[in-house]
Amino acid sequence: MKIAIPITDENFDEVLLKARNADILEFRVDSFTNKDISFVSGLLKKAKENGFETILTIRSEKEGGAYVENRVEMFEKLMPLSDYTDIELSSTDIIAYISRLSKEYNKKLIVSYHNFEMTPANFVIKETIREALRYGDIPKIALKANSYEDVARLMCSAIDIKTPKILISMGEFGKISRIAGFIFGSFISYAYLEKPNAPGQLSLEEMLKLKEMFYLR
């Protein structure tokens, strides 16, 4: 079980201290104030020096991110410095290229899919996971849960996928998935330090308490 904290470049040294009990820092580069490649490179190296794994994420506008003009160049230059890279399944114009890059650099590629409105039918979830695995190593499926049944359907739809995966039910109903997902093979859960980055996200403090309560390793 690994806990990831999405971060920007704001108060970076303070974040390193506050996040010391987390495992991974997700660099949301699309939300950085300073997107200079050499600057971001320096922060990635500093995170590694402080014992964190890192996820490079440059989220697209259509999945909740901000526009980045030189997005592909940033992937090219920064991927070698990060343990994982996250690319949206919906980024159809560049996903095949990013997939090839990840293989060249021998880096793990997270292929993510977000639905902020609903949890689709089970066969749609399974097909989305299969499509994600065409390009990457780790499917990340984040769906809005409008009932506890939606949470259960997501978890059960992916239970036969034996490769590493990330399963998230968003919203109030989905809060339980942030910790229960580990039981169904989800190996990363995202938490926050100051304010949630996604609906239903738990704080790092809450996640650590739940991890201890349920003896999750």
From Swiss-Prot:
3-dehydroquinate binds at residues 26-28, 59, 178, 201. This is 3-dehydroquinate dehydratase. Pathway: Metabolic intermediate biosynthesis; chorismate biosynthesis; chorismate from D-erythrose 4-phosphate and phosphoenolpyruvate: step 3/7. Disulfide bonds: none annotated. CDD domains: DHQase_I. Pfam families: DHquinase_I. InterPro entries: 3-dehydroquinate_DH_AS (IPR018508), Aldolase_TIM (IPR013785), DHquinase_I (IPR001381), Type-I_3-dehydroquinase (IPR050146). Signal peptide: none annotated. It is an enzyme of class 4 (lyase). It comes from Hydrogenobaculum sp. (strain Y04AAS1). It catalyses: 3-dehydroquinate = 3-dehydroshikimate + H2O. Keywords: Amino-acid biosynthesis, Aromatic amino acid biosynthesis, Lyase, Schiff base. Its EC number is 4.2.1.10. One of its GO terms (biological process) is 3,4-dihydroxybenzoate biosynthetic process. The active site is at 114 (proton donor/acceptor), 140 (schiff-base intermediate with substrate). Homodimer. Involved in the third step of the chorismate pathway, which leads to the biosynthesis of aromatic amino acids. Catalyzes the cis-dehydration of 3-dehydroquinate (DHQ) and introduces the first double bond of the aromatic ring to yield 3-dehydroshikimate. One of its GO terms (molecular function) is 3-dehydroquinate dehydratase activity. It comes from the Bacteria. Belongs to the type-I 3-dehydroquinase family.
